[in-house]
């Protein structure tokens, strides 16, 4: 494949590319590039938001390039100094290694292990002396740091910014120097840090890396970016039926965006779906089922995707309950709030109370609206929590206290 053809593929769905001319020239001159992605080992659970960048990395691999996956063990072990949010807990070296292993296992569902070089930035950052840090810090100015949106906002509002926070973009940039990256990828929120990498590489006599950013996708709520902390995420490790169901719950407005960024469906076909939905000649639900099937198939295989689709049609389109569901045995009466927590349907009593008060809990199809309801251990009932969680309760006559 010619360099021009490679660039045409690689720039697809990209937000920032600095610059296309440099990328083309670098491929022509070097052939195989070193493509960098830095990852945070304190959060090893990957979701579809991470898949956007990982899929672009896989495109580089399929074209013969090498992906350098940098695990930020140095950062994880010293903790996040930022005072803006809850401080990230410091991790031991053992915890970092375990999280890195979990991250790899999930990332390799998309990446090719044979074309992935795994590095820990503690390899070089642990060895830096204080003099080395001063030299690194001298290569960037406070004025330039304050061009970053979050720093500028906090400075304007008089919110403290620790000197150590300025060192984090520099540490990330030095990673690029250490592994001599040709390209660095990230979400659009990483643009500033990636550009710092270009500058620092130049300061150390290296050719500056090409910067490539990918869109940040909204979560299942269609409003906030996909994040575990927002509870709107779809995890790589979600069971097939849950993954399919979550995808079917996204707003119609996200269907095309998800298709472009998360599937290999040809662009011509995606454009056809987009046109037909605008013309109202196709039901968005049917297009969403194609999307849900394709993503579930990618992560769980053809057979599991088919079963997940059949389950969805049976339970949610025909309003039937599944044949198989977890069985919960109770030997004494249980308050509904306590029961939800015990079976794992809610993570806390406050969440359980919220589920009940918001009308998300049903027994035998009847909504429970009182947190004082109890379930008696005589008979069998079907408990539904939200749209997708079903439990068979052995016992089951409900009684209001």
Swiss-Prot record:
Supply the source organism for this entry: Thermotoga maritima (strain ATCC 43589 / DSM 3109 / JCM 10099 / NBRC 100826 / MSB8)
Could you say which protein family the record assigns here? Belongs to the class-I aminoacyl-tRNA synthetase family. TyrS type 2 subfamily.
- HAMAP family membership: Tyr_tRNA_synth_type2
Catalysed transformations (reactions): tRNA(Tyr) + L-tyrosine + ATP = L-tyrosyl-tRNA(Tyr) + AMP + diphosphate + H(+)
Entry-linked InterPro entries = aa-tRNA-synth_Ic, Rossmann-like_a/b/a_fold, S4_RNA-bd, S4_RNA-bd_sf, SYY-like_C, Tyr-tRNA-ligase, Tyr-tRNA-ligase_bac-type, Tyr-tRNA-ligase_bac_2
Q: Name one GO biological process term.
A: tyrosyl-tRNA aminoacylation
The UniProt subunit note reads as follows: Homodimer.
Q: What is this protein called?
A: Tyrosine--tRNA ligase
Q: Which GO terms describe its cellular component?
A: cytosol
């Amino acid at each position: 494949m010619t360099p021009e053809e490679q660039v045409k593929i690689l720039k697809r769905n990209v937000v920032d590319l600095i610059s296309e001319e440099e990328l083309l020239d670098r491929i022509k001159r070097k052939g195989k590039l070193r493509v960098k992605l830095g990852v945070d080992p304190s959060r090893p659970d990957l979701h579809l938001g991470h898949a956007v960048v990982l899929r672009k990395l896989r495109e580089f691999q399929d074209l013969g390039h090498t992906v350098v996956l940098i695990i930020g063990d140095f950062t994880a072990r010293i903790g996040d100094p930022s005072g803006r949010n809850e401080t990230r807990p410091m991790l031991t070296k053992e915890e970092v290694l375990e999280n890195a292993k979990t991250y790899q296992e999930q990332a390799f569902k998309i990446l090719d292990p044979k074309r992935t070089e795994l590095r820990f930035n503690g390899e070089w950052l642990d060895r830096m002396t204080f003099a080395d840090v001063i030299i690194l810090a001298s290569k960037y100015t406070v004025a330039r740091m304050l061009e970053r949106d979050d720093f500028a906002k906090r400075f304007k509002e008089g919110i403290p910014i620790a000197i150590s926070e300025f060192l984090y973009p520099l540490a990330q940039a030095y990673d690029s120097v250490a592994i001599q990256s040709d390209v660095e990828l990230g979400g659009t929120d990483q643009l500033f840090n990636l550009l710092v990498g270009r500058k620092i590489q130049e300061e150390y006599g290296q050719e500056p890396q090409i910067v490539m950013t990918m869109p940040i996708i909204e979560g299942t709520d269609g409003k906030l970016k996909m994040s575990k902390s927002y509870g709107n995420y779809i995890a790589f490790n979600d069971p097939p039926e849950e993954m399919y169901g979550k995808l079917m719950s996204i707003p119609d407005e996200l269907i095309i965006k998800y298709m472009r960024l998360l599937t290999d469906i040809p662009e011509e076909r995606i454009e056809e779906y987009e046109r037909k939905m605008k013309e109202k000649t196709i039901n968005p639900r049917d297009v969403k089922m194609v999307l849900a099937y394709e993503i579930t198939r990618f992560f769980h295989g053809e057979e599991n995707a088919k079963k997940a689709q059949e389950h969805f049609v049976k339970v949610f389109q025909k309003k039937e309950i599944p044949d198989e569901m977890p069985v919960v045995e109770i030997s004494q009466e249980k308050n509904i709030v306590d029961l939800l927590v015990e079976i794992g349907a809610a993570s806390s009593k406050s969440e359980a109370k919220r589920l009940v008060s918001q009308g998300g809990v049903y027994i035998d199809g009847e909504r429970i609206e009182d947190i004082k309801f109890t379930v008696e251990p005589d008979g069998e009932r079907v408990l539904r929590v939200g749209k997708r969680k079903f439990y068979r309760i052995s016992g089951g006559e409900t009684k209001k206290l």
